[in-house]
């Protein structure tokens, strides 16, 4: 069997794809390996290669996993421990035979579902058309209009709240039950079921998987793209002699905002509002018509049909929402139930990287394969999930909202609500006074206890206020009321908040309530008060300890040293696999130029030199505009919005901007301006000649691939070092230097570590920006690194391998332009 066939790739894979798949497979086969860092440039089929390698390994090894004594005896008692080995082996063979027969029966059933012309599920059917489902009739309130008007005051009034919220509701008690207790109740309940339901429930054990693949990515669209790639594949059965055809059991997990099918809940616009509304509906007397946290619901005919319909084919997140609608089954909770039955589960970063969310979802990573895509974002994402910030203006706005709300609904709020709203307003006042009194500059570190110590406020009060916010759902009621009030007063200008303020305050208070030595409170510009996690490795270590292997994949993973330092500082090198592949394009389709003339030095001290800006920089872009064919666009990246604005202003004053615009239409990204991409794309499509100035780390530097004619040349203007005077970087640097000194390092060592830290941030941004230029094997482009500091060997070592390997020997503007012209002449001749 050749390698291409071995991995069941749907196409004829490139050599680099075969190398990647073999590397991942070998890593999974080696129990010593815990982490793999895989770099595969944009356009090289990374996602499909990851699917083929991980799922091939799983199918190759599932038979051994299933036949293991531990697996077969997982639900048995210890009564067989004293039996002879031949008795145990016979028993084991009998159990395995029964499991495989049941699995074969289940696969045939799924095939019938897939082939039926009139499926049980008809996509696009509305909930209202399913009124015939007697066991889940939608209440009259669910048929009410979706939009909430300001006159619907009942929607905004907090339900009666007792004491300090220390009591536990029936709903919370039910949902706090352990998985084992839930399963015990389910078994007890199943004994009361009719034979039809028992028959349906038989397949639950047939589809159990001891090892799963968890695939996590940053955005909803990336996870949907994964589903589309998975549809292309076809894998053989793990048990070819016993089970002829084995479908891939794929379950996508999403938020309630994506999956909720209850009209009373869906009408709320924010994720936080939907979560609170869902909880309130479930705890109400009527409950939710689509979900009850009972063994009867979890083992019902409709819930089992949901599993089977989802597993009968590959469905993305929108598909399973429609499956839930058609069966009148909550797809959010049903999907969670069938994680153990899945081979592959996709989930957003938040679900994987938050320990509390994993616990809530009962995500068991033990022995499984975890694949994290776009992993260059991982450190920032972990820090962001576990950090919080609240500004002085937001605190004042929230305080005024609480006072307004209390005045409006004072007579309708019970004493428990009034008392706790007063406590909340007092706590906000404490934060307002602290910022007003103590703010001096960004980066000033703050002791968490000092925030509260001078105001007769303690952590117990913070805990009680948080309990109130969580159990009363006051946040979504108050914030939605204020938003509707603002819309009524100025409907044309009001934009809905992406995250209501009370939720932001709640997250900040949670950080204050659970202070950690691995994080720090400090001031930022605004002014604002911020908590930031400084040691993401502890959060990530829990995942590494549970999983069989964690694969960190991305198009641009350099500098890898930073990733290892922050995520796995204690992991031995022998436990880590590093893989970086070249690009699929021919070497002749990409060149990298380092423009190494002494005048091109965009340091903070020199970058605003009139001679540099109006002479050397302008002439470089003007000459480049005449060198690159008008059929192709030029992307010029700048370190910041502020610097690009200064360049544009300088060129306009000198009459240079119009000169460049005449040669090639100029578009540029503005911080608060309209998106220039559509007009730029149109100009390129019309072969008018166009140039687009964009910002490193801005809206156009990530997530958009400038393939084809959109990017025949990409220029990095300077090195995009971060703002070292931001509060975040001041605190990060201080923490890093203290860590080096506490570890026995010298002051020089600490300074070098800080220099390396800033350099790594810079080069990660460079790699992300230039990585947008190539999309497919037939693409071609030129990369210009416009700063003499790029000639530094340490800087070059942190470029992505496929960029670094194509650095040309020429370095003057004259020679670079001549080589560029030759490049396009050669392309035209091929």
Curated annotation (Swiss-Prot):
* The keyword ATP-binding is assigned to this record: yes
Q: Where along the chain is [4Fe-4S] cluster bound?
A: 260, 278, 288, 330
Cofactor(s) the protein needs: [4Fe-4S] cluster
Q: Specify where it is mainly localized.
A: nucleus
Q: Name one GO cellular component term.
A: chromatin
Q: Reaction catalysed by this chain?
A: Couples ATP hydrolysis with the unwinding of duplex DNA at the replication fork by translocating in the 5'-3' direction. This creates two antiparallel DNA single strands (ssDNA). The leading ssDNA polymer is the template for DNA polymerase III holoenzyme which synthesizes a continuous strand; ATP + H2O = ADP + phosphate + H(+)
Subcellular location(s) of the protein: Nucleus
Q: Does the keyword Iron-sulfur apply?
A: yes
Disulfide bridge partners, by residue number: none
The UniProt record lists the Helicase ATP-binding domain at: 3-438
Q: Which SMART domains match?
A: DEXDc2, HELICc2
Describe cofactor binding as the record notes it. Binds 1 [4Fe-4S] cluster.
Which keywords belong to this entry? ATP-binding, Cell cycle, DNA-binding, Helicase, Hydrolase, Iron, Iron-sulfur, Isomerase, Metal-binding, Nucleotide-binding, Nucleus
Q: List, in alphabetical order, the GO biological process terms annotated in this UniProt record.
A: establishment of sister chromatid cohesion; interstrand cross-link repair; mitotic G1 DNA damage checkpoint signaling; mitotic sister chromatid cohesion
Entry's Gene Ontology molecular function annotations: ATP binding; ATP hydrolysis activity; DNA binding; DNA helicase activity; iron-sulfur cluster binding; metal ion binding
Q: Where is this motif: DEAH box?
A: 373-376
Residues reported in the UniProt entry to bind ATP? 40-47
Q: According to its UniProt entry, what is the function of this protein? A: ATP-dependent DNA helicase important for chromosome transmission and normal cell cycle progression in G(2)/M. May have a role in changing DNA topology to allow the loading of proteins involved in maintaining sister chromatid cohesion in the vicinity of the centromeres. Has a specific role in chromosome segregation during meiosis II.
Instruction: Kindly give the PANTHER family that the UniProt entry links to this protein.
Output: ATP-DEPENDENT DNA HELICASE DDX11-RELATED (PTHR11472:SF41), DNA REPAIR DEAD HELICASE RAD3/XP-D SUBFAMILY MEMBER (PTHR11472)
**Family statement:** Belongs to the DEAD box helicase family. DEAH subfamily. DDX11/CHL1 sub-subfamily.
Under what name is this protein listed?
ATP-dependent DNA helicase CHL1
Instruction: Identify the gene encoding this protein.
Output: CHL1
């Amino acid at each position: 069997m050749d390698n291409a066939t071995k991995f069941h790739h749907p196409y004829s894979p490139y050599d680099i794809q075969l190398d990647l798949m073999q590397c991942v497979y070998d890593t999974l086969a080696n129990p010593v390996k815990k982490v793999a860092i895989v770099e595969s440039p944009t356009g090289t089929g990374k996602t499909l290669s990851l699917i083929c390698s991980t799922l091939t390994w799983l199918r190759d090894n599932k038979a051994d996993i299933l036949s293991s004594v531990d697996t077969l005896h997982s639900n048995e008692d210890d009564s067989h421990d004293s039996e002879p080995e031949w008795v145990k082996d016979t028993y084991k063979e009998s159990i395995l035979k029964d499991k495989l027969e049941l699995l074969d029966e289940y696969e045939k059933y799924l095939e019938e579902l897939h082939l039926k012309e009139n499926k049980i599920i008809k996509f696009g059917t509305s909930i209202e058309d399913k009124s015939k489902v007697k066991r889940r009739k939608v209440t009259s309130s669910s048929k009410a209009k979706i939009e909430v008007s300001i006159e619907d005051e009942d929607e905004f009034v907090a339900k009666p709240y007792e004491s300090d919220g220390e009591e536990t509701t029936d709903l919370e008690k039910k949902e706090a039950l352990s998985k084992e207790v839930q399963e015990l109740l389910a078994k007890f309940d199943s004994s009361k079921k009719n034979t039809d339901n028992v028959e349906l429930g038989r397949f639950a054990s047939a589809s159990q998987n001891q090892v799963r693949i968890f695939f996590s990515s940053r955005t909803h669209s990336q996870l949907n793209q994964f589903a589309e790639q998975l549809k292309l594949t076809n894998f053989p059965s793990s048990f070819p002699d016993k089970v002829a055809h084995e479908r891939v059991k794929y379950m996508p997990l999403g938020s309630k905002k994506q999956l909720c099918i209850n009209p009373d809940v869906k009408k709320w616009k924010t994720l936080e509002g939907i979560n609170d509304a869902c909880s309130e509906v479930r705890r109400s007397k009527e409950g939710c018509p689509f979900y009850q946290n009972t063994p009867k619901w979890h083992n019902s005919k409709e819930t089992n049909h949901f599993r089977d319909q989802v597993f009968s084919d590959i469905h993305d997140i929108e598909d399973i929402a429609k499956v839930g609608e058609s069966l009148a089954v909550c797809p959010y909770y049903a999907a969670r139930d069938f994680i153990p039955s899945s081979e592959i589960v996709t989930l957003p970063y938040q679900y994987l990287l938050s320990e509390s969310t994993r616990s809530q979802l009962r995500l068991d990573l033990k022995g499984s394969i975890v694949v994290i895509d776009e992993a260059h974002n991982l450190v920032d994402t972990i820090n962001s999930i576990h950090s919080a910030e609240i500004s002085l203006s937001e605190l004042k706005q929230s305080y005024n909202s609480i006072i307004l709300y209390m005045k409006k609904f004072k007579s309708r709020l019970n004493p428990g609500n009034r008392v706790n709203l007063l406590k909340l307003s007092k706590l906000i006042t404490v934060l307002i006074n602290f910022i007003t009194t103590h703010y001096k500059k960004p980066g000033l570190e703050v002791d968490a206890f000092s925030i509260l110590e001078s105001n007769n406020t303690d952590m117990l009060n913070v805990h009680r206020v948080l309990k109130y916010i969580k159990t009363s759902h006051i946040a979504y009621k108050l914030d939605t009321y204020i938003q509707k009030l603002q819309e009524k007063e100025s409907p044309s200008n009001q934009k809905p908040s992406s995250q209501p303020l009370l939720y932001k305050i709640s997250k900040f208070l949670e950080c204050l309530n659970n202070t950690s030595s691995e994080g720090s409170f400090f001031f930022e510009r605004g002014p604002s008060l911020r908590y930031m996690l400084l040691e993401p490795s502890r959060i990530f270590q829990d995942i590494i300890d549970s999983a069989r292997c964690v694969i960190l994949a991305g198009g641009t993973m350099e500098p890898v040293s930073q990733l290892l330092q922050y995520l796995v500082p204690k992991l031995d090198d022998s436990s880590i696999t590093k893989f970086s592949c070249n690009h699929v394009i021919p070497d002749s389709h990409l060149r990298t130029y380092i423009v190494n003339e002494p005048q091109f030095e965009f340091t903070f001290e020199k970058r605003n030199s009139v001679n540099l800006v109006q002479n050397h920089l302008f002439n470089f872009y003007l000459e480049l505009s005449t060198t690159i064919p008008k059929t192709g666009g030029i992307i010029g990246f700048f370190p910041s919005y502020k610097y690009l604005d200064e360049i544009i202003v300088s060129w306009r004053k000198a009459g240079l901007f119009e000169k460049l615009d005449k040669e090639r239409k100029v578009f540029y990204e503005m911080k608060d301006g309209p998106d220039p991409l559509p007009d730029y794309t149109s100009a390129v499509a019309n072969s008018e000649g166009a140039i687009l100035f964009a910002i490193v780390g801005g809206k156009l530097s990530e997530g958009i691939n400038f393939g084809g004619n959109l990017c025949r040349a990409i220029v990095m203007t300077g090195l995009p070092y971060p703002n070292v005077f931001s509060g975040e970087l001041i605190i990060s640097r201080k923490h890093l230097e203290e860590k080096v000194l506490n570890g026995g390092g010298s002051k020089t060592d600490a300074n070098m570590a800080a220099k390396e830290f800033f350099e790594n941030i810079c080069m990660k941004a460079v790699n992300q920006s230039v990585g947008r230029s190539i999309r497919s094997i037939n693409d071609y482009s030129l990369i210009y690194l416009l700063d003499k500091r790029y000639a530094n060997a340490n800087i070059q070592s942190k470029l992505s391998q496929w960029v670094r390997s194509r650095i040309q020997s020429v370095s003057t503007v004259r020679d670079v332009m001549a080589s560029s012209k030759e490049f396009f002449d050669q392309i035209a001749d091929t």
